[in-house]
A protein has these predicted regions:
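C-terminal His-loop and adjacent cap/lid subdomain of alpha/beta-hydrolase
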Residues: 1-430
Length: 430
């Protein structure tokens, strides 16, 4: 079923709902999330087919616009759609269509999203706790404005001084140096850094003694690497957004190419300055994020009070890869902590965060990074099986098949001191 939703005079939300034959329907509904700036029904190729194979009625939408962030220029209602309204309206109308088609409402509804979809997931739990019974929130691009401010600060510093860029060849060298320094902190040398927050790598040890080679860094490149992993702060030292984690050595600005990618640039030229010709060289870490928040602060899913979602029996399963080169993994740790600070430390019966060693952005990576998140969430919500561990599998850097338990944050998978380090049974959550 294809539909266009118009909850405001300037709304145009494109929605697609897939309905399996009645005999194959599992009685449930799954909404899938978006990525980047949305702008298309991005679940059509992967997420929606996966949901359909499980027997779900499933839906996706385009967040209320086409393309990148340029839609925000002169269209405040479309900004609201992108921020939160499109997901909610698409969910309400999709469930109505499902009910009409099968002549009964879905018995349970789930949301499954990563990146922008992760922010959408958190926004649903915060604003519309009645929409979903279980929510899967991966690598949330959140807070949207602070995330893009941190990226702008790192990228523009290098674009203004191209000699400070770190070429891809050197990024591989940096990644190896980080691995050599921190791989063994978890007790096992297996090319997996299980707890990057415990890594205290100092990039100055890579500085060239003379000249410039692929196996060392210039002084300016050392500063760039340090900036990449350090938190972005205002001129007064206030945190803007965490730095990337030492779980990997990628995502360092190269200094190559033109202006910052539209993904991050659009937040400031359209949301903040509302000027398509705004010059990125004028980016100011103190004033520009504040201007964006003044105009569209509702885009950030930062409310830590999820009491209504908890009260109706909802389950929120968060995850983030420690080697994410796009969104600092610590951002998920910080939001999870904010909920515990607000609601109390004992929330594990409905809220859990799993940090995945070696996983990149949303999925992939060299190691046990393949995870059946949906089954874990289903078992939790439908059978009361609290995910004390979740199984992960994959291929390591040496080509060996690996399995390992994922542990609810802040626990880590710890080697028992005996057994095959490629097998999950040799590890315990501590």
């Amino acid at each position: 079923v294809v539909a266009v939703l118009r909850p405001s005079s300037d709304s145009e939300i494109n929605l697609e709902v897939w309905l399996p034959p009645a005999a194959e329907w599992n009685g449930k509904f799954q909404m899938v999330g978006n990525g980047g700036w949305g702008g298309s029904i991005q679940g059509l190729e992967s997420a929606m087919p996966a949901a359909l194979r499980r027997g779900y009625a499933t839906a996706g939408h385009d967040t209320g616009h086409r393309g990148g962030g340029e839609f925000a220029l002169g269209h405040p209602e479309k900004v609201i759609d992108f921020a939160y309204r499109a997901v909610h309206e698409a969910t309400v109308q999709s469930k109505a269509l499902v009910g009409a088609f099968y002549e009964r409402a879905p018995r349970l509804s789930y949301f499954n999203g990563c990146s922008l979809g992760g922010r959408q997931a958190l926004m649903e739990a915060q604003r519309y706790p009645e929409d979903f019974d279980g929510i899967l929130a991966g690598a949330a691009a959140n807070p949207h404005i602070a995330l893009h401010a941190g990226s702008m600060a790192r990228v523009t510093a290098v674009l203004k001084d191209p000699e400070s860029g770190v070429p891809q060849a050197k990024q591989a060298f940096v990644a190896r140096a980080i691995m050599n320094a921190c791989d063994g902190l978890d007790g096992v040398k297996d090319t997996i850094i299980s707890d990057p927050m415990a890594c205290r790598f100092d990039p100055s040890v890579l500085r060239c003694k003379s000249g410039d080679r692929d196996d060392c860094l210039t002084a300016k490149q050392v500063d760039t690497v340090r900036r990449n992993y350090a938190p972005t702060t205002t001129s007064q030292g206030a945190l803007v957004f965490p730095g990337l984690s030492f779980g990997g050595g990628r995502g360092i600005p190269t200094g190559e190419g033109g202006p910052p990618a539209p993904l991050i640039l659009d937040t400031f030229r359209y949301l903040a300055h509302q000027d398509r010709n705004w010059d990125w060289r004028r980016f100011d870490i103190d004033s520009d994020p504040e201007l964006a928040r003044k105009n569209a602060g509702f885009i950030d899913a930062v409310n830590p009070d999820l009491s209504p979602f908890k009260a109706r029996g909802g389950k929120l399963l968060m995850y983030h890869g420690w080697s994410d080169p796009l969104i600092a993994p610590e951002s998920s740790v910080r939001y999870h902590a904010s909920v515990l600070d607000r609601m109390g430390s004992d929330q594990g019966n409905w809220l859990r965060l799993f940090m995945v060693p070696a996983m990149g952005h949303c999925s992939g990576g060299s190691g046990p990074t393949s995870v059946d998140w949906v089954s874990a969430l289903e078992a939790w919500r439908e059978q009361g099986k609290v995910p004390d561990t979740i199984a992960a599998s994959g291929t390591g850097a040496t080509g060996a098949r690996m399995t390992r338990p994922l542990c609810p944050h802040p626990q880590r998978a710890t080697y028992k001191g005996r057994g095959d380090t490629n097998k999950a049974e040799s590890f315990a959550c501590k």
